[in-house]
Amino acid sequence: MRTLRGRFLALLVAGLATGIAANAASAEAPPADNGHNVILVTLDGVRVQEFFGGMDPVLAKAPEAQSGIYDAEVTSKRWWRETPEARREALMPFVWKTLAPAGIVLGNQAKGSKVTVRNDQWFSYPGYSEILTGQAQPDVKSNDLVRYPHRTVLEYARDSLALSPTQVAQVGSWDGFKYAASSKDGAFFMSGARDPVPAALSTPEIDLYNGLRQQIQQLWEESSNDVLSYRIGIEYLKKHRPRVMWLGLGQSDDWAHARRYDLVLDYLHLADGLIAELWQTLQSMDEYRGRTTLIITTDHGRGRTPADWAEHDAGIPGCQDIWIAILGPKTPALGEAHDFPDVTQGDVAATMLQYLGLDGRDFNAKARPPVPRSLKTE
């Protein structure tokens, strides 16, 4: 009996030890890479009014001194339609005719879908920080071009999936984007408003677009032309096949601050076309087709009235209201969200990670959860 009991105890201890070792190895092992890709596109300071309703009837009727519309007849002919649905389809046809039927569009409060920022600043850097870290960061209170010690979803994805520095990328038209993208210099490929692309990573096309980007005059020193930034991003994507990429576009905010509502509308149509081309490019490449999610959002809203629509800060109602659009093979085709749980800007980070097979809680315990119902259930 003692011999059998001793053998039993020895086997039991050995089994427990094996189980503990296996659990420890499992806990230490990196998550399985599901091979999915995520592309984040941000359009700076785009209001819910235009995104969901096209040309705003309030601003369409406002005096030129408030709207900045240079030729009301021309602008109305381009963008005015009788219904909000017709106006938004004319303004952003890819979003409303391609993305919305196959994906999710959130933020139309008239239909019971609310997306808001949680930071208390309501301008750019705090918004991008909230998007990329999953939470409002109390110490981010300016647009100063500095890095903060908050790990971003881009850094976490690279580390967790053991991606190379070229497989995570940020390309944008404002220098603030490259600072918001990472807590550390050189964590992955980052390109600001006029940064030259290193020769080892560049192509003749990238060199051409970057040279033009240096020459074209912009409204603000810290920004560059969105079309050229987009072209650099597309060429980088074709050459290096990043798994995670953030493309930051900013001229929507530039034209709004210049109080040129007509040019804001023209720009949104242009940006929609660029995003459509991006999606078509992704579908033409084996590495991306059927395995890529596109997420589009904005950093803040703007004022709601003719007097304050051009501006944004914590004292202007409406600047907290934003939107999110998602398209991809893992996203259910919910369309324009109706009677939907409230969503915040910080939900974007964990939403990106869920498509990559990662858990936002491991990234940042204080991060917001993913957008509800944004992942297909098998």
Where are the predicted features?
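Active-site His/acidic residue clusters
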Residues: 183-185, 231-277
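Non-catalytic, well-ordered alpha-helical segments in soluble enzyme domains
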Residues: 154, 158-161, 339-372
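Active-site rim elements
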Residues: 78-86, 140-144, 264-265, 309-311, ...
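Metal-dependent active-site segment of extracytoplasmic phospho-/sulfohydrolases and closely related
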Residues: 39-40, 48, 270-311, 352
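Histidine-centered active-site microenvironments of extracellular/periplasmic hydrolases
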Residues: 62, 296-329
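Active-site-proximal alpha/beta segments of enzymes that process anionic O-linked groups
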Residues: 53, 57, 79-239, 368-373
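Bacterial N-terminal signal peptides
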Residues: 9-21
